[in-house]
Amino acid sequence: MNTSHSDYPFDLGTHCPAFVVTNDEAAAWFATGLSWLYGFNHEEAIGCFRHAARADDGFALAWWGIAISSGPFMNKPWEWLTMPEKEQALAACHGAIAEAMSRTANAPPEARALIEALAVRYPQTEVPDDGVLASWERAYADAMIPVYEAYGDDPDIAALYIDSQIMLTPWQIYDVDKRAPNPEAREREIQAALERSLAGTGADHIGVLHFDIHVQEMSPTPEKALPSARRLQELAPPDAGHLQHMPSHIHALVGDFDEATRCSRLSMATDKRFMANLHRTPFYRTLVCHDVHMLMFAGMQTGNLADAADAAIVMAEILENVLVHRPVTHMDMTLEGYYATIAHVDVRFGRWQQIADREFAGDPAFMPVSHAMHHQARAVALAALGRHDEADMAAADFDAARARVPAGYAYFNNQADDILAVGAAMMRGEMAYHAGETEAGFDWLREAVAAEDRLVYTEPRAWMHPPRHALGALLLEQGRIDEARVIYERDLGHEEELPVSRQNRGNVWSLSGLAECYEKLGDPRAGDAGAALAAALPLADQPVTSSCFCRGRAGGSGTA
């Protein structure tokens, strides 16, 4: 079907690479497709590139766009795909790049170089083992080096080169715990390309800005990407929801949850306009959920129940009638993981009775992690209410549900069982504490902290309620003020003890706990801590007098 670009309902801006040579209609479709590509909506990008190919049968880059959009990217690497998904992707990629290669005779040199480089990434339609697929990624990254050397001043060439190098170690450019580059990553080359491009025209390029945020967020210095985050807030196209969301990654890491919330609200409003199209872009649903997840996280970190609860409601709406079969693909598991985060909201805000009264809505076979999270939350709530026998039964239900989660089940970038290990230790810690087994409770909560610290980086967090907040609150309740002080200082990043991505800078809960510790210790830093807390409290819509609602007399409502 031939559709005029003027009738397309979404505004993705008008940026078109300087090396695109075609008619106006094809160029408009190509520009829109490329913006969707930079915004990780590959499925919609494919449709736009197909329109470009129909508008100009000799337009080689349109077929390049189809090929690159049909293949792996940061949020969908080869190793996350099932065999049928790999077969479908490779057939599409190989076929499209062959079409592009057949049209390069009159293509500009930059376009021809991009097409020839991408061709080495998809040399056949038969799916090999993962080792060979990885070698194809290396071959493509290597092929992009001379392209970048020749044309790297062009921001689109720079963005595509940076992406090719990132894809050698997606989400693993840095070793978070060692606070150093992963030896397998081309970190030096990536950073050099980013610095060069950001010093030039890349400073106004949505792809370069997007990739800069992703690279720096995993580094020891995420604040380095603040200029890119702020510029992307200004430049993200009106209908590119994920690009509007992306600055929130950096804002959250540096503790600016007001800006993270603002980005999240904007992206969610944009995503709402696109929702009717999710039937044709099923993978993009994961990105829409991700944007909502960030608002949930920001609300939980600021003590704003309205924001967190709104996000939970929207998350449930997005996933309505979606989680209706056994999860098979990584996408299935990711969507189910997003649904599972909803259970964390009521725990964070101590809504114990609501949790205790709630029955699980859904089929446990289709929602195994959500089912386990439901029982974990009930055990914590019942223990806080002093209903210890019922808490024991809920804990047994959690153990049974956890055991039924299939081996290898993914939960974002982590294994589901590693996430549930945090919940198990946190649950048993609070249960033991409220049952009067104080030391056992602290031991379990320290194990929860250690389990959370072992998780693979993901932003926002897969486990939404930091165990340090519970541990610090209950240590304070027992008068162990100096121990609590250390917990809060580490959580807020006041010490070098924790990598940045394991800190919770600027969160109102630890600010409250640390201010209380300093005041009780007579610490001269009490004034500064109180001022920091006073600055954070206006974002909260709930009283915050402790870092966890689990603090308080067993059987009571708890305090925070």
Predicted regions and their residues:
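C-terminal non-catalytic interaction modules
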Residues: 486, 490-499, 503-560
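Single-residue signature of alpha-solenoid repeat helices
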Residues: 45, 93, 140, 190, ...
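Short coil/linker segments at helix-helix boundaries
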Residues: 2-58, 63-153, 160-204, 209-219, ...
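TPR/TPR-like (Sel1-like) alpha-helical repeat modules
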Residues: 60, 67-72, 83-102, 252, ...
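TPR-repeat structural position
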Residues: 42, 187, 222, 257, ...
